Structure formats: C-alpha cells, structure tokens
Amino acid sequence: MLKGNLAGLMKQAQQMQENMRKMQEQLAQIEVEGQSGAGLVKVTMTCRNEVRRVSIDPSLLADDKDMLEDLVAAAFNDAVRKAEATSQEKMSGMTSGLPLPPGFKLPF
C-alpha cells in the first residue's frame, strides 16, 4: 500500500515539474508593457523579466535628463509589476491544489 502511494506521489511530482516547465516557457513568451509620463515612455518585457523594448517619445529627448531617467525607471517598474501580476495569475491555476500558506510567492 505504501509503495503504491509513494509511486503515485512521485508520478504527481514529475507531472507538476513538467507543467511548471511548460508554464515557464509560456511566461517567457508573454509580453507586458509598462508606461509612464502618459505613455511617453514605454517598456516592454516578458513575464520572465526580459526587457524587449524601450520606447521614448522624441519630444522627451530635448527635455531634462533627470526627468527622462525618472520616467524610464517608472515605466520599467510598471512593467515589472504587470509581469508579476500576469505570472501570478497564470500560475494560480497550477498551484490552486497545493497547500500553500496565504500570500506565499513561488520563485517564478
């Protein structure tokens, strides 16, 4: 009896590992866009936090360098928040059956 339960748990763990691998591959393909300055600065990144594009409206290039740097940082942070939210949403279906404490964040 114990052997059968252990084998079932091992099979379940392997299936979960495979599902995680597939989900991580999918997250690497999903892009989110963070913005600041009413869309004048945009950062596009994957849900694996790989920046794909940074777009800066030409009207900002002649302006204050410090302001532009702040807008780029704000757009990047906005993109990171969106990537995290999207990742959590996608992964919640996979982890819904796990006995995890409330607010527990998995490292992906």
Swiss-Prot record:
Subcellular localization(s) per the UniProt record: Cytoplasm, Nucleoid
Pfam families the UniProt entry points to: YbaB_DNA_bd
Gene Ontology cellular component terms for the protein in this record: bacterial nucleoid; cytosol
Composition skew (Pro residues), residue ranges: 99-108
Main localization category: cytoplasm
Bias (Polar residues): 85-95
Signal peptide: none
Name listed for the protein in its UniProt record: Nucleoid-associated protein Bmul_1447/BMULJ_01796
Native source species: Burkholderia multivorans (strain ATCC 17616 / 249)
